[in-house]
C-alpha cells in the first residue's frame, strides 16, 4: 500500500508563513477598500503583519503540515 500524505490546506498556505523561530505570521485583512471611513491609525495598523496567538497556532500548523 502507498503511504498516505497529508493534504495542505491551500487557503491557509496562502495566508500564513512560518518564521525561522517557528512562529506563524499572518497579514491583516480589511484595508483594501472602504478606507475613507477608517481612521489613519486603523489603516496603519492594518499594514503590519501579526503573529497567530499560541493557543490556536497548533490548529493552523495542522493546515500547513509541510511548511512547519
UniProtKB/Swiss-Prot annotation:
SUPFAM superfamilies: L35p-like. Signal peptide: none annotated. The keyword Ribonucleoprotein applies. The keyword Magnesium does not apply. One of its GO terms (cellular component) is cytosolic large ribosomal subunit. One of its GO terms (biological process) is translation. GO terms for molecular function: structural constituent of ribosome. Keywords: Ribonucleoprotein, Ribosomal protein. PANTHER family: 54S RIBOSOMAL PROTEIN BL35M, LARGE RIBOSOMAL SUBUNIT PROTEIN BL35M. This is Large ribosomal subunit protein bL35. The lineage of its organism: Bacteria, Pseudomonadati, Aquificota, Aquificia, Aquificales.
Amino acid at each position: 500500500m502507498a503511504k498516505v500524505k497529508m493534504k495542505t490546506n491551500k487557503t491557509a498556505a496562502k495566508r500564513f508563513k512560518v518564521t525561522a523561530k517557528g512562529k506563524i505570521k499572518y497579514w491583516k485583512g480589511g484595508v483594501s477598500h472602504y478606507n475613507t471611513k477608517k481612521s489613519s491609525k486603523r489603516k496603519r495598523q492594518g499594514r503590519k503583519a501579526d503573529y497567530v496567538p499560541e493557543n490556536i497556532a497548533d490548529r493552523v500548523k495542522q493546515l500547513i503540515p509541510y511548511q512547519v
